[in-house]
């Protein structure tokens, strides 16, 4: 989606409007962000914030995305072009904290416990698959590993059902 595409950029500028929302809703569709989405989110936000953001599946306003490190700058829509032209002058953003394998193992247990309160793995395997994938690979930039993990979820009956629900709800909004 759009957020994953933006995450591939070195610098992200978001418009400061009440309707600007930045999100990775894939978990609600029974999959998780692949194709570098997981890696790039961790790289920007750090492991803990990135996983909480991805596991929620909920979009965040631009100003919160700025505080979390997901975007680099938030400007009024009328200033987007000028901000893009001047982006080289902007201070380099700090990298998110990336955890080692021992820390990931510890945090994975805590994340699974939190997810278990909200989602039964029989019906919502994606959050558990995301945690397991992250625990194993961390912020390793390997699109092939991400693609394989996401594809196995994409082909599942749970994901097909969640995607159908999404499309039905989306159709009701129109």
What is the meaning of each model-derived region?
Residues 4-7, 50-152, 160-174:
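Amphipathic alpha-helical segments at domain termini/boundaries
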């Amino acid at each position: 989606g759009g957020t994953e595409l933006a995450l591939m950029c070195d610098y992200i500028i978001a418009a400061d409007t009440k309707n600007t929302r930045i999100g990775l809703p894939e978990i609600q569709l029974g999959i998780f962000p692949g194709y570098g989405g997981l890696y790039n989110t961790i790289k920007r936000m750090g492991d803990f914030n990135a996983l909480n953001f991805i596991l929620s599946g909920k979009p965040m306003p631009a100003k919160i995305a700025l505080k979390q490190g997901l975007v680099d700058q938030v400007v009024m829509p009328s200033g987007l072009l000028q901000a893009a032209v001047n982006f080289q002058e902007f201070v380099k953003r700090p990298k998110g904290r990336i955890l080692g394998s021992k820390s990931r193992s510890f945090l994975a247990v805590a994340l699974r416990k939190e997810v278990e309160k909200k989602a039964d793995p029989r019906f919502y395997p994606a959050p558990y698959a995301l945690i397991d994938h992250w625990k194993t690979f961390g912020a390793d930039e390997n699109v092939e590993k991400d693609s394989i993990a996401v594809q196995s979820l994409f082909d599942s009956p749970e994901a097909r059902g969640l995607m159908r629900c999404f499309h039905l709800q989306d159709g009701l909004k129109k």
